[in-house]
């Protein structure tokens, strides 16, 4: 299953909060335009209209360079454009804009982990988790677990993920990550239990069904493995995960 980080900058930017105006003083139209252009840049990026995304984020940075959401959007867009130096610059600038922002800490942590600096990435996630203004520390603990797992540090990954469950006992993303870690560590019965907990609390995904199939095969429960593979074929017929499954089955029968 591919490495992924929970609840990061794109989702935050698309639904950026609007603060109530406390006085008659109107918002600066140029600053507001910068925020709007940052959100538009993310929308264009999601549609793979990358030139338009770059044009919008360049405008946003000219209009409102001191805004946290603008800097986070710039980091996301430039990383998608494979300009990692500019992306890192903007993720770090977001943190300088608000050193206590858990969103900025999470975004920089994810960037560092994606680009191989697992130690510093984990440190940023743990800072976010310990941030007293952060309402969802389970997200950062889960992200720290993903980061540690991608570095091959499975024991540390399990520790972070169990910290996430200690904060919030029902968080599906933590369940699936723990299933992966337990499977990697050879503890397939516990891995199965976490897949079951995920499927009891969230809709199935192609990743989860494929991982569940692999776990059941490791447990030599062919009936359970077949049930999950049939679900994958029925619910996600055009998925990459189904192609992976087909390749695995060809190798097993070849």
Please describe what each predicted stretch is.
Residues 46-47, 80-81, 114-115, 131, ...:
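Register position in tetratricopeptide repeats
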Residues 39, 72-73, 107, 141-143, ...:
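Canonical tetratricopeptide repeat
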